[in-house]
Amino acid sequence: MNSRGLILTLGVVIAVAFAQQDSEVEREMMKRKSAYMRFGRSDGGNPMEMEKRKSAYMRFGKRSSGGDEQELVGGDDIDMEKRKSAYMRFGKRSGPQEDDMPMEKRKSAYMRFGKRSSDMEVIGNEGVDGDAHDLFKRKSAYMRFGKRSMGEEEDHDMMKRKSAYMRFGR
């Protein structure tokens, strides 16, 4: 009888521990589900939150040509233009939009974030105006974190760039 009582007590303790573990797992699943629903798919939920998620998805992801796209209002048209211009600035450009932005602006944005053509060619095209200062800023940023070319004079500013180059470069 003593062993039966011990087995029964042990069974109750195991059942209680298992029930508590299930509730903790369930609570953790609810937290994860809540976070998942906030940033991903959901089973319906609040329509206002659904619109926010859809809007964020459209801003940073693919856009489908479904019926929901037809419900654009004035503010959404502006959002669409912003998305298009951001895409044009940092992504591929195609046909008619290419003429919307002057060649100089596209070239400088490309130079800032991508490969650069020879510095002398750019300096020759820009002359002495505000763009020359912009070129110097781009050149110094390039020199700070990458290879250096062209012999510049060694002044205090150059020594700063050189030490930063030595820290982050080869």
Swiss-Prot record:
Q: Which UniProt keywords apply?
A: Amidation, Cleavage on pair of basic residues, Neuropeptide, Pyrrolidone carboxylic acid, Repeat, Secreted, Signal
Q: Which InterPro entries match?
A: FMRFamid-related_peptide-like, FMRFamide-related_np
The main location is secreted
Q: Which Pfam families match?
A: FARP
According to the record, the signal peptide region is 1-19
Q: Where are residues bearing Phenylalanine amide located in the sequence?
A: 39, 60, 90, 113, 145, 168
Q: Provide the tissue specificity.
A: Each flp gene is expressed in a distinct set of neurons. Flp-6 is expressed in the ASE sensory neurons, AFD, ASG, PVT and I1 neurons.
Propeptide position ranges: 42-51, 63-81, 93-104, 116-136, 148-159
One GO biological process this protein is involved in is: germ-line stem cell population maintenance
Is Phosphoprotein among the key words of this record? Answer: no
Q: Which family does it belong to?
A: Belongs to the FARP (FMRFamide related peptide) family.
**Protein's name according to its UniProt entry:** FMRFamide-like neuropeptides 6
